[in-house]
Amino acid sequence: GTRLNQLRFSIGDASLTDKQMAELQHKHDLIKNNESSELSDKLENGLPLSVDLKGVDGVVGYKAKKHSKLIDCDKVKNYKVSSFWEKITIDDLIISEENQNRSLVLSPDAFYILCSKESVSVPKNLAAEMRPYDTNIGEFRAHYAGFFDPGFGSPELDANNTKAVLEIRSHDVPFIIEDGQTICRLIYEPMSNIPDKLY
């Protein structure tokens, strides 16, 4: 059958404390921004991840089309991206004349895919999950599919500099996000065993 969900089991509260995550960040550089392990925001209820509105080749992300045809999830690489997503380019951003800061207005209830500024790595003895909603950050939700498996972005798998995909939806009213703004937080959890197969 078609696999659409992922299920994780935990014994009690398996989340690491901020102190434990700070120690791991110092030891393993769990998240890095341009090779720097300095965090973009304070470590509180997880490691902060910020949004990248600089983009690559003029593209900063994608916005889901409201209406599209049905898909067969088992037909991988069978559909055109343009059938389901609109590109968000630099031309769609608000760029400050004063300091060249970049901002994006999120339309109410629209669904966006953006990229984190930071690269993320998950050691093989850990898993990670994005904190899906934080009322201190704003009236939107990120993240809808926030599981990170052991080995994600791991240097030993030649996968370093792997960014996180940020799935974002604004609620009720338009919402402005700025380049480098903290969007969500990453919480690490220890595995009961090291998996035989890494991400």
Regions found by a protein language model. Give the residues of each.
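DUTPase catalytic domain/fold
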Residues: G1-Y199
